[in-house]
Amino acid sequence: MTERPLDVTLPGFADPVGQAQACFRAVLDAMARPGTLVRAGEGLVPPAPLDPATGAVLLSLVDHDTPLWLDPGMQPARDWIAFHCGAGFANQPVCASFVLAQKLPDLTRLSPGTHEQPETAATLILQVDSLTDGARYRLRGPGLRTFGMLSARGLPDDFAAIWQRNRAGFPLGVDLVLCAGTTLAALPRSVTVERVT
Amino acid sequence: MPAETPHNARRHWMAVLARAAADELAAGLAAHGGVPVYQCLRGPESGLVMVRGRAGGGGAPFNLGEMTVTRCTVRTADGQIGHAYVRGRDARQAELAAALDALLQDPVRGAALHAGVIVRLAAEQAAGRSETARKAAATKVQFFAMRNMRAA
């Protein structure tokens, strides 16, 4: 059996254990306080089109036990992800534990988990253009005493309605990690989203 | 003997490199153009791998035990990628073995390096193995007497 050699030109984390733990902690904090911007992936140089935060989240969370589905736009980074994460790739989005995308995919095509095991739902890692400007959303839910705010450029105009449908199936549903540059924010399935501007 | 494809040739030299000590690898590199300019893509990093076996080579697989392995992947300035997995925790050995693996794939330097380093290391390792086998063979017990008694 001869497989195509992987085309990898860039290293992963310089300090794999320390940096993966730091990024894991950043994702935990972001999930616990929806909408909060946290820093991740500083010093990491992933291949295009990945941003440092996106690459760091992949290196920290994805491995051979968690099938990953790639949006067609993310295919150029496939070899780097395969080499550094040891990731297995899913052919269908519904089979994936993690979904990596640049454009919001149809959330109803992702695994929402089961009532016995809602934790098996897919986590969507979505790279957006910016988390500091763009459309503004007001967030409510666990982890937010009153409400939180999120700005994002690169989400569809009807994102609040799409998220509402994802929220309606709670405790089933998809969790979302938004990455841009070296920052990330998270929307767990428990949060409700309302567009402000 | 398997056909001499590039794949098999590489498998052979990677095995030879994995069995060679760091100093032998460094000496081989120094004698053939020195250590190349390279970047570590991964590692060197140590970890455990589970070694599995099959009783008699054909039985059900079982876990024999874990062993420490160090791996490294480097990319030379020319774009060749070299991998190494070596037994133990010697990071320098893994890094040098990966650098040599990358250089051996180089169409220009590869052949000379193979002739100068791999062939010699392979011969030394084969000599070491046959020496061990010779010493072990001297202690082998032949149960002639018992077999003859049963036959009688």
Map each language-model feature to its residues.
Chain A
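Internal, well-folded beta-alpha domain core
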Residues: 65-66, 75-197
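N-terminal, charge-rich interaction modules
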Residues: 1-67, 71-73, 83-85, 182-183, ...
